[in-house]
C-alpha cells in the first residue's frame, strides 16, 4: 500500500501533504548531514585571491536572500556578473543551453550546483567554454549522493569519471570531493580552457 503522504508523479516520488514547516526542517537536516555549500564556499575562498581584479561570471546565482550566490567571496573582483534562468530573482537572464546573449568573456566562470538541473548538458558545456577568455578558469560543482531537489528539473548525478569525459576539452587543475571516495556527496572541479 502506498503511503498517503507520498504521491508518485511519473518516475519521481515527492512529498505532497507535509506542512511547509516539516519540509523546511527536513531540508535543514539534509543540508547538515550532506553539506554541499559549505565545502564549496571553503574551496572558493581558497582560490578567490587568484581572481582579484578579474572578470567573473556566476551561472545560477539563485536567491541572494539565502546566500546562494558566491559574490561575497569574490568581493575583490573587477566585475562580478550574476545570472540565472529565473529572471524574477533580479539577476541578468542567462540560459546556458541556448544561444548566448552576453558579449563579454570572463576570467572565471562559476557553475556551481547547476549542471544537475540542465537536460541538454552538451550545449551547456559548449556555452561555458564560449563564455571563457582564453586560458580562463571554470569552477563546476555537482552533488552526487544527495536528495532530489528543485523537481522536476533535477536530472543528473555525475561521477568524477563522467565529469572528466564531459569536460575533456578542458585542462583539469583541481578535483575535490566531499564525503568518502566510494560515497561522495559532491564533486568540485577547477578547469582551465585551453
Spell out what each predicted region is.
Residues 154-170:
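Short alpha-helix
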Residues 18-50:
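Class I SAM-dependent methyltransferase Rossmann-like catalytic core
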Residues 171-181:
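Conserved S-adenosyl-L-methionine
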Amino acid at each position: 500500500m502506498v503511503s498517503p503522504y507520498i504521491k508518485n508523479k511519473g518516475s519521481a516520488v515527492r512529498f505532497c501533504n507535509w506542512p511547509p514547516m516539516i519540509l523546511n526542517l527536513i531540508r535543514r537536516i539534509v543540508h547538515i548531514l550532506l553539506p554541499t555549500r559549505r565545502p564549496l564556499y571553503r574551496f572558493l575562498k581558497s582560490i578567490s585571491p587568484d581572481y582579484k581584479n578579474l572578470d567573473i561570471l556566476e551561472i545560477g546565482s539563485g536567491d541572494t536572500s539565502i546566500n546562494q550566490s558566491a559574490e561575497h567571496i569574490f568581493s575583490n573582483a573587477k566585475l562580478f556578473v550574476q545570472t540565472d534562468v529565473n529572471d524574477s530573482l533580479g539577476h541578468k537572464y542567462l540560459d546556458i543551453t541556448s544561444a548566448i546573449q552576453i558579449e563579454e568573456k570572463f576570467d572565471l566562470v562559476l557553475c556551481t550546483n547547476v549542471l544537475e538541473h540542465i537536460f541538454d548538458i552538451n550545449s551547456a558545456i559548449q556555452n561555458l567554454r564560449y563564455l571563457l577568455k582564453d586560458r580562463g578558469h571554470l569552477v563546476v560543482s555537482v552533488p552526487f549522493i544527495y536528495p532530489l531537489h528543485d523537481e522536476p528539473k533535477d536530472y543528473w548525478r555525475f561521477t568524477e569519471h563522467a565529469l572528466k569525459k564531459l569536460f575533456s576539452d578542458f585542462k583539469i587543475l583541481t578535483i575535490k570531493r566531499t564525503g568518502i571516495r566510494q560515497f561522495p556527496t559532491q564533486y568540485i572541479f577547477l578547469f582551465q580552457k585551453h
